[in-house]
Structure formats: structure tokens, C-alpha cells
């Protein structure tokens, strides 16, 4: 079992130059936002300066500037996707946040083998009816890269992907762990255009939460996917005990890898896991994470993912004014989400529309 100490809220690093106060802060942030809209990209030092912004009032100003970047670089379409847990529990890996690990099975994690194609397709149709444009097949385990040559599960998943394309209009995605270049090509040929494989944390912090595989193992899979022409969906979890430097480094690593979609999960501690007694993030700390990710990743699809309801509660709508332009709707892997109708109503109240958001470069090219 990974022994992860419970850490206090990350301390904000001291800025190299003072952050403006009062009304000057809003103008300063808008200037930075305009720089980014015009094509500049923040350095690590500049991004760390943003982490020195504290207090609800100032964080909301940071969010407003991030929302300006989102509006100008991505538009008003909120990317909607849904997932299905196609194989659950008894995972070989020891990710300290996950209740599916065989090293520390969570109290609420179901255990079952690969679902049938019929079960998965039924859920794909339900996701499509709820407004999702993409549907991701998620499986436990380190990856199909390590499957036995006699294992037919990968072929079953490929066939299910083909059937989803034939029987629905929703786009199939996968999250099956590590893949070889050859497997990535097979997924592409079957019709998978986007694949989720989260980095989860910075390279520096990763060994504190996982020891059964490395951060570089995850990077290798992302590179294999992109080489096969598959879009990379990769993000992380906020609230593991990481520092602000770790958060900034994760965002910059995702930028360097040119990922298209970035899920931001907010830790919802699960009993039975090493992080089960962690506190949930403060709402304003979560908003600050979202806004800073948008400053670093101006054109990426940044997605509200796991923990949205648990951490944000009745303030979920603020994330959609803090740089977020995508949502995972419906249920999560081992926990329940709120009804999709509630999400659609929230979007409408904010003047946003659900659909399929542009990937980096698409929105600006269309203007």
C-alpha cells in the first residue's frame, strides 16, 4: 500500500514580483488574459505568480479573466461526454486515491468482469439521449498492453466500439490503461478518436500516490496514442496533497504533450483508500485551480470531471465561469453524478450550450 501522508492545504509560493491589489488586480489580470488571447503562453514563473492570488473576491477576478480566455479561445459550446465502467475492481495498481485497487479496495467499489456489448451499447444510447456527444469505455488495470495473448477482452472492446458507431451517433472513446503503438493503431482503425489516460499529478508528486508504475509510463502511452492519430484526453486530480508548484507543473506538462482534452478531477475521498481521510478542497481553491489551468491551457478542452458535485455543490456553476468548457455528465466510475437534465438547465442559465467543443486550433481557425 502506498503510504501517503495527509498534507495541509498547499502553501502559495511567494511571487517574484508583487501582485496588484484592489481594482488594479482586475486590470492586470485582463491584460494578462489579452496577452494569452493574442498568442502568448505563460512561463512557469508567470503561472506561479497567479497562485499568489488569494481570497474569494480576488479569486473570482482571476476566474473572470480565465472565462474571458475561454470565451475568446474556445467559444460558448460546453463539451459533454459520459463514461461507463466496463470492468471494475481488483485492479493491480496501487493508486492511492482509487477505490478499485486490489491493494486497498474501497468500501463502495463494485467488482465485476467485462460487461457485454449489449450492456455497453444500451448505456451509450442512454448517454446520447441525455445529450452527451462522446462515450468513454473505462476499464480497471494497468493496461491492455499487459493482457495475455490469449485474452480476448481487447478484441471484444474493439468490436463494441464498432457497434457503437454503427448503432448510435455518439463518438466512442476508451480508457483502457497503457497501450502499445500497435494497439493504439488498432483502436484508431476501430473508430476511437480520443483516449483518456490521465497523468494524475506532476512528475515530482506522482511517486507519492502511485508506485506500481511510473509517470513516464503514462507519458509513453499518450505519445503512442498521438502517434496513431488519436486525440489525448489527459488531466489530473486536485486535492491529493500536491503543492501549487505541482499543479502548475502538471498543466505545463499537459501543454507540452499537446493534449486536446484535460479532465480536472476534484478528490472525493473514498473510505478504505489511503486518501480516504483527506479533506475535500475548498470551493475557492478548486476555482483557482480551474482558472490557472485555463491561463496555461487557453485552447484546450478543460473538463469538469469526478468530484464536481461533491466539492462544488450548489456553486458548480462558478466553474463554468472560471475557464471550464466541458463536463462529464451522468455517473462516474464508482459514484453517482447528478441528473443530466440538471446539468443542461445549468448550462442554459449561463447562456452556454452543450455540444462538442473545438480542439486546440479549431476555434480560432473558424473565426
From Swiss-Prot:
Coiled coil: none annotated. Pfam families: BATS, Radical_SAM. Its cofactor is [4Fe-4S] cluster; [2Fe-2S] cluster. The gene is bioB. Its EC number is 2.8.1.6. Catalyzes the conversion of dethiobiotin (DTB) to biotin by the insertion of a sulfur atom into dethiobiotin via a radical-based mechanism. GO terms for molecular function: 2 iron, 2 sulfur cluster binding; 4 iron, 4 sulfur cluster binding; biotin synthase activity; iron ion binding. It is an enzyme of class 2 (transferase). PANTHER family: BIOTIN SYNTHASE (PTHR22976), BIOTIN SYNTHASE, MITOCHONDRIAL (PTHR22976:SF2). Binds 1 [4Fe-4S] cluster. The cluster is coordinated with 3 cysteines and an exchangeable S-adenosyl-L-methionine. Binds 1 [2Fe-2S] cluster. The cluster is coordinated with 3 cysteines and 1 arginine. SUPFAM superfamilies: Radical SAM enzymes. Belongs to the radical SAM superfamily. Biotin synthase family. Pathway: Cofactor biosynthesis; biotin biosynthesis; biotin from 7,8-diaminononanoate: step 2/2. Keywords: 2Fe-2S, 4Fe-4S, Biotin biosynthesis, Iron, Iron-sulfur, Metal-binding, S-adenosyl-L-methionine, Transferase. [4Fe-4S] cluster binds at residues 91, 95, 98. Gene3D superfamilies: Aldolase class I. Homodimer. [2Fe-2S] cluster binds at residues 136, 173, 233, 303. The keyword S-adenosyl-L-methionine applies. GO terms for biological process: biotin biosynthetic process. InterPro entries: Aldolase_TIM (IPR013785), BATS_dom (IPR010722), Biotin_synth/BioAB (IPR002684), Biotin_synthase (IPR024177), Elp3/MiaA/NifB-like_rSAM (IPR006638), rSAM (IPR007197). It comes from the Bacteria. This is Biotin synthase.
Amino acid at each position: 500500500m502506498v503510504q501517503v501522508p495527509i498534507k495541509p492545504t498547499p502553501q502559495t509560493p511567494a511571487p517574484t514580483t508583487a501582485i496588484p491589489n484592489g481594482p488594479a488586480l482586475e486590470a492586470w489580470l485582463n491584460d494578462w488574459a489579452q496577452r494569452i488571447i493574442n498568442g502568448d503562453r505563460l512561463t512557469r514563473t508567470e503561472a506561479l505568480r497567479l497562485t499568489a492570488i488569494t481570497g474569494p473576491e480576488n479569486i473570482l477576478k482571476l476566474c473572470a479573466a480565465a472565462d474571458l480566455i475561454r470565451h475568446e479561445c474556445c467559444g460558448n459550446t460546453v463539451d459533454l461526454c459520459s463514461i461507463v465502467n466496463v470492468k471494475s475492481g481488483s485492479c493491480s495498481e496501487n493508486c492511492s486515491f482509487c477505490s478499485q485497487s486490489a491493494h486497498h479496495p474501497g468500501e463502495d467499489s463494485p467488482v465485476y468482469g467485462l460487461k457485454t456489448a449489449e450492456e455497453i451499447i444500451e448505456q451509450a444510447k442512454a448517454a446520447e439521449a441525455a445529450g452527451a456527444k462522446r462515450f468513454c469505455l473505462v476499464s480497471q488495470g494497468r493496461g491492455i498492453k499487459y493482457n495475455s495473448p490469449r485474452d480476448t477482452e481487447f478484441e471484444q472492446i474493439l468490436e463494441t466500439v464498432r457497434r457503437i458507431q454503427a448503432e448510435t451517433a455518439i463518438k466512442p472513446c476508451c480508457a483502457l490503461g497503457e497501450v502499445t503503438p500497435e494497439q493504439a493503431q488498432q483502436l484508431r482503425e476501430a473508430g476511437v478518436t480520443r483516449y483518456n489516460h490521465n497523468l494524475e499529478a506532476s512528475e515530482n508528486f506522482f511517486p507519492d500516490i502511485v508506485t506500481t508504475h511510473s509517470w513516464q509510463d503514462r507519458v509513453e502511452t499518450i505519445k503512442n496514442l498521438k502517434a496513431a492519430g488519436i486525440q489525448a484526453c489527459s488531466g489530473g486530480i486536485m486535492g491529493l496533497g500536491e503543492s501549487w508548484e505541482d499543479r502548475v507543473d502538471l498543466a505545463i506538462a499537459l501543454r507540452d504533450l499537446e493534449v486536446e482534452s484535460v479532465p480536472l478531477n476534484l478528490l472525493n475521498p473514498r473510505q478504505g483508500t489511503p486518501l480516504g481521510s483527506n479533506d475535500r478542497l475548498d470551493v475557492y481553491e478548486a476555482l483557482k485551480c480551474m482558472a490557472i489551468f485555463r491561463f496555461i491551457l487557453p485552447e484546450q478542452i478543460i473538463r469538469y470531471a469526478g468530484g464536481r458535485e461533491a466539492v462544488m455543490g450548489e456553486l458548480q456553476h462558478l466553474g463554468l465561469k472560471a475557464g471550464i468548457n466541458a463536463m462529464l455528465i451522468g455517473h462516474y466510475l464508482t459514484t453517482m453524478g447528478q441528473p443530466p437534465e440538471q446539468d443542461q438547465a445549468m448550462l442554459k442559465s449561463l447562456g452556454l450550450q452543450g455540444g462538442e467543443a473545438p480542439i486546440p486550433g479549431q476555434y480560432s481557425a473558424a473565426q
